[in-house]
Amino acid sequence: MRLAFSVLCFVSAASAYAAEPAALLKVNQSGYLNQGQKLAVIPGKSQQAFQLVALPSGQIVFKDQSSEAQLWAPAGETVSIADFTQVQNNGRYRLEVAGYAPVELQIAAQPYAQLHDAAIKAYYFNRASQQLDPAYAGVWARPAGHPDDKVKIHASAASASRPTGTVVQSPKGWYDAGDYNKYIVNSGISTFTLLDAWTDFTAFYRQRQWTIPESDNSMPDLLDEVLWNLDWMSSMQDPADGGVYHKLTTLNFEGAVMPHQAVAQRYLVQKTTAAALNFAAVMAKASRVLSEFEAQQPGKAALFRQQAIQAWQWASKNPAIYYQQPADVSTGAYGDKNLADEFAWAAAELYLLTGKEPYLQQFFQMAQPVQTPSWASVAALGYFSLAKEANNLTPEQRQLVFSAITAVADQFAAQHQASAYKVAMVPEDFVWGSNAVAMNKAILLYKANQITAKASYVEAMQGLLDYVLGRNPLDLTYVTGFGIKSPQHIHHRPSQADAINAPVPGWLAGGAQPGQQDKCKYNSTLPAKSYVDDWCSYASNEVTINWNAPLVYMLAAFSQPAPKL
């Protein structure tokens, strides 16, 4: 059954948030799972009586006292927690605390399904080389931009078979973030995370659609979307030697114009080891996923398999070619000089693709400690894939993989319990893209819960999702187009240039972090409050494909039947 999805439904979110959000009750503005944890934050230095009132009847359905008040240092706030987990009936409710403005909330069996569809559809809105028609894009329809059929080889990428200035084709793909360039390294974790969502929630995605041009074909919408980027990634490999170009870019960032108005020459820049390894890992996983869809995508699984192996071979011969930004290029670098985690991740994916033991041996030789995943720290991704296919491992290997994941998850669960806000975010998590840190921590907790089911893991996962959806010091849903209050001025060129008041929906803003590298005007330097909803703030209000991917994953996770969490 086709699930209708109208982008027009997202334009109603309020544009501005209160000057003093600390004085407000904080809830998950998208709602709570009927069988899940339900927490709200009450500011103040003492316990508070609270009650939940059913709407529209006005009946009081739950009363209790909040927890002991505690200081949450990242926000400089003393707060207590209202826990109404016992309330499980679906419906609209009002949370009431004397002295505070009441706040409405929703309890539902699937409160996040529509939000999920918007978060994944954000990738459609960021497609390069395609016109967005009103039938699919609504008011955000636009002409095609960047056909990328006349891309030049930059001097940094020149080779005997492709000298400087050679013209090549490299269409499709997703614009990386607020800019219009395309980067292999950042596409690595982004594309992998979406493929992993397919792997972990296959039944959900077989029946879920969100109105993209491919929705009527015989492929799941998720894989159609991912293929748009995989096809571009495939074109970024030099067929002569298997090396992979680091990025497709203009020399400098374009201005705040629509994609079809950004017409500066674009280039393929430098082959790097990091690009080759990200490419190898993603193409190996994609080959496994697409093997089921040979009729719809003939030859593609075999092509991606071959390309993954060739990229690995190139990286093995060139293990330390790091990205060096050319003097005439000023766009994103995605530089990384610690590649042991990329080697281990790619080795794990190639082992699962080929079944060849040397790849598995390479994984265990190169494996790094598990950390919260990011584009520069991908050690956990190989563990995730091996844990999913643990029957292929010896008992000793299986235990090593499992314990590497669960040990970190135990730390995150402890952070949740210790937090006054009941969110597993500590000061060092408030970095560029802090909201993606929250979502990637939640993914790790989900993976751990699949190994050993623990209520503490699920509670910490929910706490992290609550945080980005409104239960935070700014009383802000960080996803455009949703909640009572959400970002209106994201650092995203189409949203800035399209003359539409509302931003493109479904994008997760980067989030609070004290670096303030953009030199915009902020109201606070506190880690969890250092955020400004302004186009100028690329340090806190940009959107990127790698930040949205873990949000998509977690919204899919929380759209599963509760016993499967």
Task: Write out the residue ranges for each language-model feature.
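C-terminal transactivation domains of fungal Zn(2)-Cys(6)
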Residues: 208, 249, 282-334, 391-392
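N-terminal edge beta-strand
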Residues: 21-23
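Proline-centered turn/helix-capping motifs that create local helix->coil transitions or kinks
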Residues: 237-246, 320-323, 355, 414-417
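Bacterial N-terminal signal peptides
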Residues: 4-13
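Boundary at the C-terminal end of the N-terminal hydrophobic targeting segment
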Residues: 16-19
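HEAT/HEAT-like alpha-solenoid repeats
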Residues: 234, 313-316, 364, 368
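Aromatic (Trp/Tyr) and acidic
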Residues: 26-99, 103, 109-111, 121, ...
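Surface-exposed, active-site-proximal loop segments in enzymatic domains
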Residues: 203-218, 260
